[in-house]
Amino acid sequence: MKRILIPLCIVVGSHVAYGQRSYQFDAPDRLFVEGKELFSLKNYAGCIDKLEAYKQHSTDADLIQEADYMLVYAAYEQGRPNADELLKDYLEEYPASRHSDEIGYMIGSVHFERGEYEKAIFWFNEADIDMLSPEQQEAYSFRLAYSLLQTGEMEKARGYFARIEQIGDKYKEASTYYVAYIDYAMGNYNNALIEFSRLKESPKYREQSQYYIAQIYFIPVSYTHLRAHETGAYL
């Protein structure tokens, strides 16, 4: 019996040791999977903890790069003050990353939120819009258009706003307003009147639209009044 028990103890012990080695081997990968799941759920605080722990134990260069992407993305979503620097550091470390266009879009968005419109334009132009998600594409187009408007490039801005007005969702109404505003500012009053009229029932833009509509109706009256006065025909 003893000769049987001893080998059994050895066998059981070897299985326990193997199980421990297997757990130690799989632990980093499990941290990555858990971090990625939390990332997909937009639990950025939780995902950061898991991915930082993963990086401390992993030697897989590809997964570390993906973890770094999720970490800087999380920093951006959390609105960290140094998010743009973290994003730029990522691009410097991984210039050939498949996420480079999205990172450029996020850097541009950080500068946009700060009112740094020239920097925003630069970084938006570094990103290929076709490589972004549909939601990001609309935000990209609107933020680039608004940045162009703020830097005096009205015609370029109008092109982007008009496109969003046609196919947009979240920024559709705002884009209609800015198309109308640009038309008004450039003297295209008939087009501006049409666009502003679409917003007369808008809770957000109704007041501004009615103001500009009134201004447009006043412009021909003022012009006629002036011409009549100049020719002596005004009574």
Predicted regions located by residue number:
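Short solvent-exposed coil/turn linkers within tandem alpha-helical repeat scaffolds
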Residues: 21-25, 55-64, 91-101, 128-138, ...
